[in-house]
Amino acid sequence: MNENKKKMYDLPGPKTVEAMKKRHFDAYYCSTAAEAVEKALELIPKTDSVSWGGVMTVDELGLKQRLAQEGYTLIDRDTAKDPAEKQALMHQALSCGTFLMSSNAISKDGQLVNIDGMGNRVAAMCYGPRQVVVIAGMNKVLGTLDDAIARARNIAAPANAQRFGIKTPCGLTGQCGDCTSPDCICSYVVVTRNSMVHERIKVILVGEDLGL
């Protein structure tokens, strides 16, 4: 990464972490992806079952492979043999020990913004798993809550629609059409502004570009 861009991440990143701590998130700043992987492993007890939503960041980090190598019990919907088994695994994930996810956007004052189609990912954030570990690159951090919501709707959602080949307006044009299509992946827009169960939600901010 360009040295100047790296400074643009490393200087404000810890301030956003401090803002998150005031909202009762257990938050950390890692300058590199490698550091973030080690921090995530440190936060996940070996006795936990671990699952995740459809999350590019975790894939990019190679964290799933590390968890498998370390002998964790994984609830992986991608191993399902048919749609019924996939649904069963997704329900099982809602009561796992640790749920891994990223965030579509984050405001500088520490609020997490997530858009979801089926709702399983935001459901896990709100309630169910013993803890949630959110890993997000600094490219997801925006100035205000409104900025973060705009990023989630106008950048993350269209990019994910194209990633999954979904024929919504944003999937076809690259721009949000504020649709209510049957295939809409923006059914739920959730702002997590506080962790009521203190430190249940853990956030690792990474000084690199990760995810969409």
Residues covered by each model-derived region:
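Conserved phosphate- and dinucleotide-binding cores of soluble alpha/beta proteins
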Residues: 94-212
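Conserved short-loop catalytic and cofactor-binding motifs
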Residues: 4, 24, 136
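N-terminal active-site beta-alpha-beta segment that forms phosphate/nucleotide-binding
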Residues: 9-90, 95-100
